[in-house]
């Protein structure tokens, strides 16, 4: 869900004239805000500055046993969280990316909301960076359905570069480049998915730095 919100915002940021000409920009912002409002509610540690984020509501096996409307499932709905003792760097960093990209989409339209999104994004990225771990190791019910196959390194780069774009803070760009090099990401990738953000990170790094090593990888993307 966080990955979907990031990509929706990215589309609006990259092609605003297309959305405006189609009369769809307001609909796009509404769709993104539906997701980011939810993420803000899930970030339950925000008021105290603690690391606590609810990453899943519902049991996978139980939910998949019924293909009906949520309104017709007033049954067992357990909730699962990540926190300082049970981290989820991939989930926290991806959510930070979604909030940061959404802040850019709302910049100049609802500045108070954009600022709120940045505040939550920065806390979540700190959580991801300081308490390392795969979310599916902490929320074990997710393993059979949305396991973090690729780990969290790509999301740490992805989240940092989005925060740089949204805030202009050099520390985030420095961190994105440092982690990109540290994690050995200097090779081409074949796809962008909810679990693998390397291709997207390479695009953003190429745009923000203009460095040939990032640009070259995009010319051979396949």
What are the functions of these language-model segments?
Residues 1-222:
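Glycan-recognition and catalytic cores of secretory/periplasmic carbohydrate-active enzymes
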């Amino acid at each position: 869900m966080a990955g979907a919100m990031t990509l929706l915002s990215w589309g609006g940021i990259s092609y605003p004239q297309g959305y405006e000409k189609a009369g769809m920009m307001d609909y796009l912002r509404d769709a993104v805000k539906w997701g980011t409002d939810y993420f803000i509610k899930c970030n339950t540690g925000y008021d105290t500055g603690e690391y606590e984020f609810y990453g899943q509501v519902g049991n996978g096996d139980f939910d998949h046993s019924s293909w009906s409307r949520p309104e017709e499932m007033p049954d067992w709905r357990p909730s699962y969280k990540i926190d300082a003792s049970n981290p989820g760097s991939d989930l926290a960093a991806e959510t930070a990316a979604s909030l940061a990209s959404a802040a850019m989409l709302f910049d100049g339209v609802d500045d108070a909301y954009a600022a709120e999104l940045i505040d939550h994004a920065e806390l979540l990225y700190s959580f991801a960076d300081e308490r390392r771990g795969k979310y599916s190791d902490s929320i074990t019910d997710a393993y059979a359905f949305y396991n973090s196959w690729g780990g969290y390194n790509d999301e740490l780069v992805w989240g940092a570069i989005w925060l740089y774009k949204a805030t202009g803070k050099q520390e985030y760009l420095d961190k994105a480049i440092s982690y990109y090099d540290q994690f050995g990401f200097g090779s081409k990738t074949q796809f962008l998915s909810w679990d693998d953000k390397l291709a997207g990170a390479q695009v953003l790094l190429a745009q923000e730095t203009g460095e040939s090593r990032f640009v070259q990888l995009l010319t051979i993307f396949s």
